[in-house]
From Swiss-Prot:
InterPro entries: Cell_Proc_Reg/RNA_Proc, FHA_dom, SMAD_FHA_dom_sf
Keywords of the record: Phosphoprotein
Sites bearing Phosphothreonine, chain numbering: 20-21
Name of the protein this chain belongs to: Glycogen accumulation regulator GarA
Species annotation: Mycolicibacterium smegmatis (strain ATCC 700084 / mc(2)155) (Mycobacterium smegmatis)
Domain FHA: 76-125
PANTHER family, per database record: NUCLEAR INHIBITOR OF PROTEIN PHOSPHATASE-1 (PTHR23308)
């Protein structure tokens, strides 16, 4: 008898419970997030050195966790296409998945017709203005959005 055959009986392993119980899966995801959040602490401390008006995306979870992407252009593309500014090489990512746009001093993420959608803080969005610490999910990649110092041209004249 193979391991595959033995799963047909009443034997319930933890792996089966994790895969079939959504409540446990939600708890499991929260547990997974805790150690991953610790990995972004170094990135947060490096934010002070960012150019004014720019931002940083840090891959918190996914095939290239720990990677950092500087957002310093009016539009930054993300997707599985090799010409994307942020190349996310995984089948869960559309070739042209999302864009990060800087408009009026604020960054927003815009889904550009992806198959699996774009999420901000686990909520599906077509577009959303990003705040410091927001989590953007593109396919299986989770990226933390970190802002640099604001460029303050108004009211700073002495």
């Amino acid at each position: 008898m193979t391991d595959k055959d033995s799963n047909l009986g009443a034997d319930q392993s933890e792996d089966v419970t994790v895969e079939t119980t959504s409540v446990f899966r939600a708890d499991f995801l929260n547990e997974l997030d805790a150690p991953a959040a610790a990995g972004t602490e170094g990135a947060v401390s490096g934010v002070e050195g960012l150019p004014s008006g720019s931002a940083l995306l840090v891959v918190k979870r996914g095939p290239n966790a720990g990677s950092r992407f500087l957002l310093d252009q009016p539009t930054t593309s993300a997707g599985r296409h090799p010409d994307s500014d942020i190349f996310l090489d995984d089948v869960t990512v559309s070739r042209r998945h999302a864009e990060f746009r800087l408009e009026g001093g604020e960054f927003q993420v815009v889904d550009v017709g992806s198959l699996n959608g774009t999420y901000v803080n686990r909520e599906p969005v077509d577009s959303a203005v990003l705040a410091n610490g927001d989590e953007v999910q593109i396919g299986k990649f989770r990226l933390v959005f970190l802002t640099g110092p604001k460029s303050d041209d108004s009211g700073s004249n002495a």
